[in-house]
């Protein structure tokens, strides 16, 4: 019974984590990205990391938000204010979210890459 409760709790936590719309492809991918890049944004929780990624993804381009569409329906954005970079699929599934070391130059290089 305890194992069933744990499994249901994990399932519910995953549902709540991704309830606001598409997040990463799956929980494992999300956990890996958070472990690798979460500290770049300060001492933030996984929920906050996902919220920031979704916010940048959903913010219209213009002003400090740069956007480039790539082949295969991949969209990249860069926020000049925070230095954050995101890449996501046409269905809004997040591929990556982090702060590149060379900021806007990274975004511009990625925009020119074929895929």
Residues covered by each model-derived region:
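Eukaryotic low-complexity, non-globular regulatory regions
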Residues: 1-16
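Compact soluble domain cores
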Residues: 18-73
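Compact alpha-helical subdomains of small soluble proteins
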Residues: 70-95
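A short, surface-exposed interaction/processing loop segment used at functional sites
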Residues: 86-115
């Amino acid at each position: 019974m305890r194992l069933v409760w744990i499994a249901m709790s994990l399932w519910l936590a995953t549902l709540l984590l991704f309830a606001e719309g598409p997040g990463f492809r799956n929980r494992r991918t999300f956990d890996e990205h958070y472990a690798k890049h979460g500290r770049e944004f300060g001492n933030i929780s996984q929920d906050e990391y996902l919220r920031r990624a979704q916010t940048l993804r959903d913010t219209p381009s213009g002003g400090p938000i740069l956007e480039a569409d790539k082949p295969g329906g991949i969209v990249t954005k860069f926020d000049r204010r925070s230095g954050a970079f995101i890449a996501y699929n046409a269905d809004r599934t997040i591929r990556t979210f982090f702060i590149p070391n060379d900021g806007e130059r990274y975004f511009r290089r990625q925009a020119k890459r074929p895929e």
